[in-house]
Amino acid sequence: DTIYKNTGRPTLVTDRDGVVAVAGAPKREFGDKPVSDALERIMNERSVYQQRDQGENIPVTAASAALSVCVAAPILAQGDVLGCVVIARSAGDPPAGETEYTLARTVAGFLGRHMEL
């Protein structure tokens, strides 16, 4: 919710398989839906992804292309990928900036450290 309130962009948190939390988008459409193959690859790369080109559209879920990934920050705990913090965009929205990148990276780091406790 905090990222959504600060950026106005839909924000989702996933585990390895699907979406576990949604803010700024319909929970019915995105909650508990499996992540897309492309988002799964981003998680496996273990580095923060930021969309650079408006033509590049990576869907958040396998079931819907209504939201695409702006920033995706993998949640890492003890070297394992647990999920991802995703800041998304709808068609026509501009790519994310440095603020969104930093917020996603910070929240993913916090969640990863919290899971290690």
Question: Language-model features: where?
Answer:
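Structured interaction and signal-relay segments at domain junctions
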Residues: 1-64
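Short glycine-/small-residue motifs
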Residues: 22, 83-84
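Short amphipathic alpha-helical interaction segments
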Residues: 63, 67, 96-99
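A short, aliphatic-rich beta-strand micro-motif
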Residues: 69-76
